[in-house]
Amino acid sequence: IAKVFGTKYFITDVLFTKDNVEITEPKLVSLILDTRCDNMRIESNNGGRIFALNVRKAVKAKNEKCIIQAKPTTANKETRILLKSGWIKKHCYFLAEGEYKKGSDYDRFMKALTSYKKEGGNKHDDAPDGMTILAENVEFIGLCQNNRTRQVARAR
């Protein structure tokens, strides 16, 4: 979850898990409702489209509004990550280590994000890929030019 202030994106919460969809869907719905997220992009490769539809239905059933887009990614993941890394470094702000619990989704996310190597050999690239999808979503919906305060997110 990114709270947006102008062109600054504060990453305040994440859902970072390898759990199956029966566990992940309700967790994501709760996260959307708890944070009042209003825009989300879900990668629709490998069943993500159905996942996105289910999350959208569950959020709507709670009478909440969140634009949930399902979009496939076709470009090379490593190339996309490297292309957006400068934008992420410039615009994204993360919680300090003492602001999240050790062993939490946020902790695992930060470890995965900060251990990514641009030379390759990355077994676990979900965290940088998630941030890349956030950057692409921001570009897609044009938030960089918009100074409204919003909350946007990305999920896999």
Where do the protein language model's features map onto the residues?
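Short, surface-exposed amphipathic charged segments that create phosphate/polyanion-binding patches used
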Residues: 80-91, 108-116
